[in-house]
Amino acid sequence: MGLALILTFTVGACSRNATPAPAKPHVFVIVMENKTVEQALQGPFTASLASTYRVAANYSGVGYPSLPNYLALTSGQTFGIRNDNYYVLPAGGIGAQLTATGVTWRAYMEGMAHGGCLENTYPYVTHHNPFAYYGGKCPSNVVPFTDLAADLKGNTPMFGWITPDVCHDQHDCSVSVGDAWLRQTVGMITESKAWTSNGLLFIVWDEDDGSTENRVLSMVISPGKSHKVSKQGYTHYSLLATIEDTLGVGRLGQAAGAKAMTDLTAN
């Protein structure tokens, strides 16, 4: 009888003292285009983010032109592609991975009409939408950018990928135009409960202006994290590894051997 009481008390005490596992943060990614670090920082809003939050100061793209970088960010490999043509690649990538593991996600494509992800209708271009390549079609998770505002006010997915159109991403238009778009879009995200509840926003440029170093600006925007600059060598594979680790899924492709950006995501 006495032993039973002791066991009951012990189990009850352990149950009361158990600390629940912390909830996974919402993760957002915005991919900008074709600027060196110095060029990107000419945007006053971008510069203010870099001086307030966290920056990977030794971050590089994985190749040229755009498409290999987008594939690296979403699958951990480039498939040997060195152009922006359309290919039907094996089904997979982070989207399929998240779906298989029950993690909600959406990819927001600015300029894309509903159901038209394979059609290049300016200012939307397919080669800035990596999800269109895996399996030769877009899953229903790929939606127009205009859906983002409502999602941020309602049922926000755990992972949100955002591709601006080719003007707002600074590919075809000036740094100032893209910087103004970032001000509006980042403001919308950082006002949401998904971000204020320990969310993570990564802003990265896919490649530089064609130099041999291919160093690009990569920033981590998260509430409650003080300014920090990391000199660790990172690439798009590092960012993919960081996203996958944060969301609790396995690492794809070359992300498996990459160093995660934990010095920038930890408190």
Predicted region positions:
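Sec-dependent N-terminal signal peptides
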Residues: 1-6
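C-terminal motif of bacterial Sec signal peptides marking the signal peptidase cleavage site
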Residues: 11-13
